[in-house]
Amino acid sequence: MQGSVTEFLKPRLVDIEQLSLTHAKVILEPLERGFGHTLGNALRRILLSSIPGYAVTEVEIDGILHEYSTKEGIREDIIEILLNLKELAVKVQSKDNVILTLNKSGLGPVTAANIIHDSDVQIIKPQHILCHLTEENASINMRIKVQRGRGYVPASARIHKYDRPIGRLLVDACYSPVENISYNVEAARVEQRTDLDKLILEIETNGTIDPEEAIRRAATILAEQLEAFVDLRDISQPEVKEEKPEFDPVLLRPVDDLELTVRSANCLKAEAIHYIGDLVQRTEVELLKTPNLGKKSLTEIKDVLASRGLSLGMRLENWPPLGFIDK
């Protein structure tokens, strides 16, 4: 490992230990001294706050007007039921919000498995208990709204956004699919150097996203936010007016820059979609007609485009640009 004293080491992914379907440990080394904490803390904050997910935001329960009520024949009060719904882990394909229903009667527990939903919705933990019916003639009927979002949005922040009918209960929305993330920095050694860092990330999710995929998305978000500093100019220099390009440079990049999974990337190439500009002009319906490209791949593509401020179904006049040769 001979080189300039000012040359930075480039870390490599040493190991990914899948402890369970929702729990993984990732080891990265070697890092220059101090970079373990620099990268570990940045990734941890992004993983906790910036990975999109789904959460229960509104609930309507027959016979209930406000959250401070109780219902005969149910052990829990309404606030307890709302707290249990808040912990519901839901995965939705191709939709930003859905309405779920639950109708249960008779003695016994009411679980997430009793929720009625279509094929686009997956309940991660169907055994999750929502409440208990304590009488044979007791029943509960509810409508549950699940929305896509990011971070944590308390119910109080949404109270005045629109007029809501009496009986529609708001729930604090925790959209993040990452339940726990910690990092540890240990000493690493490369040849004669013993002053290096090893970064160990340990992540747990609610099951709606693979831990490895969550880390990859967080790293992508961090890299994109730092791009502005790479292109930083000295503001004291007089700015030379440049001709505004006809298209956003991002649209001229190959789809490989999106770092999609191999399956999604191959499906796009098979349809001669080589550039991001080609991709954003396609609609969801058109992409779903692509052989081997399912709803999971479509959701991945939409998420990656959204992180760049793009979406499917965009109209680009005069595409491709003059002199732009499609591979």
UniProtKB/Swiss-Prot annotation:
It comes from the Bacteria. Pfam families: RNA_pol_A_bac (PF01000), RNA_pol_A_CTD (PF03118), RNA_pol_L (PF01193). One of its GO terms (biological process) is DNA-templated transcription. Gene3D superfamilies: 5' to 3' exonuclease, C-terminal subdomain (1.10.150.20), DNA-directed RNA polymerase, insert domain (2.170.120.12), RNA polymerase, RBP11-like subunit (3.30.1360.10). One of its GO terms (molecular function) is DNA binding. Keywords: DNA-directed RNA polymerase, Nucleotidyltransferase, Transcription, Transferase. Residues 1-233 are annotated as: Alpha N-terminal domain (alpha-NTD). InterPro entries: DNA-dir_RNA_pol_insert (IPR011262), DNA-dir_RNA_pol_RpoA/D/Rpb3 (IPR011263), DNA-dir_RpoA (IPR011773), RBP11-like (IPR036603), RNAP_asu_C (IPR011260), RNApol_insert_sf (IPR036643). Its EC number is 2.7.7.6. CDD domains: RNAP_alpha_NTD (cd06928). The keyword Nucleotide-binding does not apply. The keyword Transcription applies. One of its GO terms (cellular component) is DNA-directed RNA polymerase complex. It catalyses: RNA(n) + a ribonucleoside 5'-triphosphate = RNA(n+1) + diphosphate. Residues 247-327 are annotated as: Alpha C-terminal domain (alpha-CTD). DNA-dependent RNA polymerase catalyzes the transcription of DNA into RNA using the four ribonucleoside triphosphates as substrates. The N-terminal domain is essential for RNAP assembly and basal transcription, whereas the C-terminal domain is involved in interaction with transcriptional regulators and with upstream promoter elements. Homodimer. The RNAP catalytic core consists of 2 alpha, 1 beta, 1 beta' and 1 omega subunit. When a sigma factor is associated with the core the holoenzyme is formed, which can initiate transcription. HAMAP family: RNApol_bact_RpoA. Belongs to the RNA polymerase alpha chain family. This is DNA-directed RNA polymerase subunit alpha. It comes from Baumannia cicadellinicola subsp. Homalodisca coagulata. The lineage of its organism: Bacteria, Pseudomonadati, Pseudomonadota, Gammaproteobacteria, Candidatus Palibaumannia. The gene is rpoA.
